[in-house]
Amino acid sequence: MSIFNHTPKNNYMICENDENTPSIMPLFTEISGQNDSECKTLNTKGLPILALRNMVLFPGVAIPVNVGRTKSLQLIKDAQNSHTPIGVVCQRDAAVEDPGKDDLYEVGVIGEIIKILEMPDESTTVILQGKMKRFRIDEITETFPYMRANVSLENEILPDANDKEFEALVSALKDLTFELLKNIGEQAKELVFAIRNIDSAHYLVNFLGANIPLSATQKQELLTISNIKERLFKLYEMLTQEAQLLQIKADIQSKTREDLNQQQREHFLQQQIRTIQEELGGNMQD
């Protein structure tokens, strides 16, 4: 099933939807200035709040989400019918069925319901599009028929246009990402293609934050950082640690193979020695 039928400018299809899977690779769209102006007129009082399990929505990224909770189903249908933006937040513990404020991370993203898909297995998948505004939950105002909250919008702090350090870090981040993606397979080819076609470093950070298989906790940590340069540094740090872990794993596997080969060689030699000794012993008896 294609995860996205709406076709905005500069979008890249990455993968198929998978229920409650944190490694879903979402569609990415570069959002126009109209998106930002819509957020400026957004009513931040009583904003409908959709809680996600093990998933973090980033500004400028669209993701498919399987929706099963009664409150969530009602929320997305109301939001689609009224063309109302919603607040999308990751919950701290995916096992909590009816999360309250303490069960949610404080920072989320203003989202839009792009499409609701009724699946053949009778489940519901919604395509969420992240707007270019993050928010912080101030107060929960309602819990029925679904959660609403008063929120404060938070701006993204962009680096200076001539920040050479930022440019160098973007280049290093791309190189590191390509290196990490080498062993993923066909999906990596599509992801590499998408990355190569993203010109905006701001969007690149959000795209990678959503696509790279980090934990929900790590992704939330990235989302919470308002300064894009600092977010980029943190993402690079996380990917560097991942690269180091992969190298350690590869070294262990290589050492294990060498040890096994050595054991096999020694075992073979011991068998040969025993065979020769047996033959010599037999000859002496003759």
Give the residues covered by each predicted segment.
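N-terminal low-complexity, acidic/polar interaction/targeting segments
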Residues: M1-D286
